[in-house]
């Protein structure tokens, strides 16, 4: 026996509802639909054809119906498309309640019931969107289709995929290729195919990204802190994490300074190498900055503000004694080890596993460039290859870098011209920059919930997507609640979570009063024992959405919640056509020009601009040049009338006047018992034979004297010197080469032993005195 309810016993809830509106309200609603009025007008025309007597009356009625329908305010569920240029009565100006001109720029899909288009304006998109949908709901296709809006607008987007599916890159590449913007496409692919990436690969896997190559020390510190593991609930864990954060802040202050000075390439591996206590001691005590595979750098002249944090860190290590440099007791090493071990895991993953992406100087992906120049960035996170914690760290790198870029875009100035401080923000654009975070729960970052609140003024449109609400709550329930509260556009696709996610959408939708039939009664005269309602109704409060409706949605169907409206929608499906060949952009690394060159260029451009503004483009400055003077004189004195022949004659005369005197070849004089760099090998006949294949070539001088002289003349000529002067300089240089490489050297001044000993003692005394002064100075700084 089955006690559950069979489907044939289930009632359609809409059959219990009754329309209690007045006749005029229903009539007005009927004629508000253009399809209905079209049917009425066609019907009136057909009736007038058969009943010509009523044609005049029917014409008047048709005109009234048409005018009524024509004068109705045309609306769509959300916004009218901008191309319509009509007044949008769903988009009223605040305070005066006058309609804005249509501003819809982002197409979401169509109403499933009426087929009406669903558009959102720039301001709406910058209030962000939240999408939930279970597996197979069409969530990824919806997000890809939304990103196509950005391409149509000439904008760009960032798409972070927590599932790590390479088919996503293929779809995005197809869309970008169709718009002719494949040069703007960037890919960060953390997927390694379950193998180690060592050395060059046959095919490129990813563009490069180095989050440490730019940004302030505080921004990079926060990035590292976000990668650190949770300290747990213990107070000891909080204490050790706090000390680790203090160490990172102190270290980053110095490393960022040295990076900006061009002394080091700052990446994850470089930072990890400076965890060594001996290196820290060299920096603080010896005032020497050690570098990997390079000479150390003297840092005595850098500001104390940069080195003081590291000095204070060492001084606060329990048991640390600066007098025992390099030989600290085990307690100091343990204390330092407890601090650095909290950082090793994150940096090992970045520097080793993903070194082919992170360990680079001029990275191809610069988030500031990506956002300001509206590029397209796709990030693939390996959900199957990595543990949840590791996957979270990779996502945090992207999200934290994006957050830091947003912080820089907010600006720090509050004083100055309004146009410079406010209107010239780098992201004031008529279209939003989309940040699509698919499966955000896998890589949620603590503190990212403030982004929806701040990103609106920066022109960002953050679209959070996931399968359910509990995934968002892994990082923090408060963060998840804040994201839900700060996203005005909420979309629920196929839903299978009947608990927290369902409660979230139920509360979002709210309740409404409806009129329902009270009861049914049997019709006494009916043989089939049919039921009829009792012609009475009452109202009750019901939820505006039903869980079964959300569960029965097919791929691409969704409920869209915006303000107080709920629209059952069929989402836009871009369906990009696959391309035959996929590729990853490869860029040429070019160092930025130095600051002094930029200042010089700016002055030159300013001077050129002032010349253009003055309107006087003539050059009155006399340039003294002997060649130009000679050619000008020859042209003036020439009696030839034909311009071309006169010019040729002037050039021939100039060439004849400036023809260089022939320079004789220099012959190296062979001095017995002496050698120079221009000497040939002289072989003693009695010496053992030289075991070489070609003795003549082997016996040639290291530098042929005449070829060297000719090359020097060429260099001088390229530098602007005349032939005569160039030959003289070359001969002088050849003589200098001969003197400098002459062997045996000439006898030099002889110094006796006592005098040499005295000089050495004086030098030693001066060195000792300088060292004592340096030690006293260091002791005074520490005290």
Curated annotation (Swiss-Prot):
Localization terms from the record: Cell inner membrane
One Pfam family this sequence matches: TraG-D_C
ATPase domain: annotated segments: 100-500
GO process terms (BP): protein transport
UniProt KW keywords: Cell inner membrane, Cell membrane, Membrane, Protein transport, Transmembrane, Transmembrane helix, Transport, Virulence
One Gene Ontology term, aspect cellular component: plasma membrane
Protein topology in the membrane: Single-pass membrane protein
Keyword Transmembrane in annotation: yes
Region (Interaction with IcmS/IcmW): 671-773
Membrane-spanning residues: 47-67
InterPro entries: P-loop_NTPase (IPR027417), T4SS_component (IPR051162), TraG-D_C (IPR032689)
Record's subunit section: The T4BSS is a complex nanomachine composed of several subcomplexes. This subunit is part of the Type IV Coupling Complex (T4CC), a subcomplex composed of the DotLMNYZ core and the IcmSW-LvgA adapter subunits, linked by the C-terminal tail of DotL. Six DotLMNYZ hetero-pentameric units may assemble into a hexameric nanomachine, forming an inner membrane channel for effectors to pass through. Interacts directly with DotM. Interacts directly, via its C-terminal region, with the type IV adapter proteins IcmS and IcmW. Also interacts with DotN and LvgA via its C-terminal region.
Function, as annotated: Component of the Dot/Icm type IVB secretion system (T4BSS), which is used to inject bacterial effector proteins into eukaryotic host cells. Part of a subcomplex which recruits effector proteins and delivers them to the core transmembrane subcomplex. Plays a central role in the assembly of the subcomplex. Required for the recruitment of IcmS and IcmW to the inner membrane and for the translocation of adapter-dependent substrates. May have ATPase activity.
Listed name of the protein: Type 4 coupling protein DotL
Organism the protein comes from: Legionella pneumophila subsp. pneumophila (strain Philadelphia 1 / ATCC 33152 / DSM 7513)
Gene (name only): dotL
């Amino acid at each position: 026996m089955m006690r559950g309810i069979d489907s044939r016993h289930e009632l359609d809830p809409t059959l219990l509802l009754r329309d209690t509106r007045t006749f005029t309200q229903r009539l007005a609603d009927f004629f508000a639909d253009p399809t209905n009025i079209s049917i009425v007008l066609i019907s009136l025309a057909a009736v007038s054809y058969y009943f010509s007597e009523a044609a005049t009356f029917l014409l008047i009625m048709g005109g009234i119906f048409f005018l009524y329908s024509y004068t109705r305010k045309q609306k769509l569920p959300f916004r009218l498309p901008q191309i319509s240029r009509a007044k949008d009565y769903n988009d009223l100006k605040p305070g005066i309640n006058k309609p804005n001109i249509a501003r819809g720029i982002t197409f979401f899909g169509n109403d499933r019931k009426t087929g009406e288009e669903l558009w959102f304006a720039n301001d709406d998109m910058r209030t962000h969107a939240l999408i939930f949908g279970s597996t197979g709901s069409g969530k990824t296709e919806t997000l890809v289709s939304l990103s196509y809006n950005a391409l149509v607008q000439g904008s760009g987007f960032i798409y972070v995929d927590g599932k790590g599916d390479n088919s996503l890159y293929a779809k995005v590449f197809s869309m970008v290729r169709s718009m002719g913007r494949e040069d703007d496409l960037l890919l960060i692919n953390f997927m390694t195919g379950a193998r180690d990436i060592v050395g060059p690969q046959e095919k490129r896997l990813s563009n490069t990204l180095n989050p440490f190559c730019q940004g302030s020390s505080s921004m990079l510190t926060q990035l590292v802190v976000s990668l650190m593991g949770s300290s747990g609930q213990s107070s000891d864990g909080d204490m050790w994490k706090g000390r680790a954060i203090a160490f990172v802040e102190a270290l980053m202050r110095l490393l960022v300074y040295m990076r900006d000075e061009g002394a080091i390439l700052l990446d994850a591996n470089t930072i990890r190498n400076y965890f060594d206590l001996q290196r820290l001691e060299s920096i603080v005590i010896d005032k020497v900055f050690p570098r990997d595979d390079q000479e150390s750098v003297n840092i005595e002249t850098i500001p104390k503000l940069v080195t003081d944090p590291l000095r204070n860190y060492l001084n606060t290590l329990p048991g640390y004694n600066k007098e025992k440099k390099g030989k600290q007791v085990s307690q100091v090493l343990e204390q330092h080890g407890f601090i650095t071990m909290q950082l090793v895991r994150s940096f090992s993953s970045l520097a080793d596993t993903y070194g082919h992406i992170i360990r680079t100087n001029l990275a191809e992906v610069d988030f500031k460039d990506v956002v300001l120049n509206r590029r397209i960035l796709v990030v693939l996170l390996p959900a199957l290859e990595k543990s949840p914690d590791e996957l979270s760290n990779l996502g945090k790198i992207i999200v934290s870098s994006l957050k830091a870029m947003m912080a820089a875009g907010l600006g720090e100035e509050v004083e100055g011209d309004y146009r410079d401080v406010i209107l010239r923000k780098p992201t004031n654009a008529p279209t939003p920059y989309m940040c699509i975070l698919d499966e955000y729960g896998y890589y949620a970052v603590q503190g990212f919930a403030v982004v929806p609140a701040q990103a609106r003024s920066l022109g960002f449109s953050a679209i959070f997507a996931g399968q359910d609400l509990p995934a968002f709550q892994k990082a923090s329930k408060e963060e998840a609640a804040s994201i839900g509260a700060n996203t005005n556009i909420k979309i629920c696709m196929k839903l299978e979570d009947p608990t927290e996610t369902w409660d979230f959408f139920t509360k979002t939708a709210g309740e409404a009063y409806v009129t329902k039939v009270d009861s049914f009664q049997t019709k006494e005269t009916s043989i089939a024992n049919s039921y009829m309602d009792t012609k009475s109704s009452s109202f009750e409060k019901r939820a505006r959405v039903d869980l079964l409706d959300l569960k029965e949605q097919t791929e691409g169907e969704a409920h869209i919640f915006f303000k107080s409206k709920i629209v059952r929608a069929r989402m836009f499906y871009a369906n990009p056509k696959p391309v035959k060949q996929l590729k990853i952009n490869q860029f040429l690394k070019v160092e930025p020009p130095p600051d002094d060159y930029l200042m010089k260029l700016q002055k030159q451009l300013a001077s050129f601009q002032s010349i253009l503004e003055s309107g006087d483009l003539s050059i009155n400055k006399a340039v003294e040049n002997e060649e130009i003077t000679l050619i000008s004189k020859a042209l003036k004195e020439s009696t030839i009338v034909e311009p071309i022949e006169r010019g040729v004659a002037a050039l021939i005369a100039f060439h004849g006047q400036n023809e260089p005197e022939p320079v004789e070849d220099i012959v190296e004089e062979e001095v017995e018992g002496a050698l120079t760099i221009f000497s040939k090998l002289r072989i003693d006949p009695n010496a053992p034979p030289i075991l070489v294949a070609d003795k003549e070539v082997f016996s040639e001088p290291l530098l042929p004297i005449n070829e060297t002289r000719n090359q020097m003349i060429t260099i001088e000529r390229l530098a602007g010197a005349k032939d005569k002067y160039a030959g003289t300089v070359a001969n002088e240089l050849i003589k200098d080469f001969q003197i400098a490489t002459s062997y045996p050297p000439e006898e030099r001044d002889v110094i006796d032993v006592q005098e040499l000993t005295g000089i050495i003692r004086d030098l030693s005394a001066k060195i000792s005195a300088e060292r004592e002064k340096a030690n006293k100075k260091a002791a005074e700084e520490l005290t």
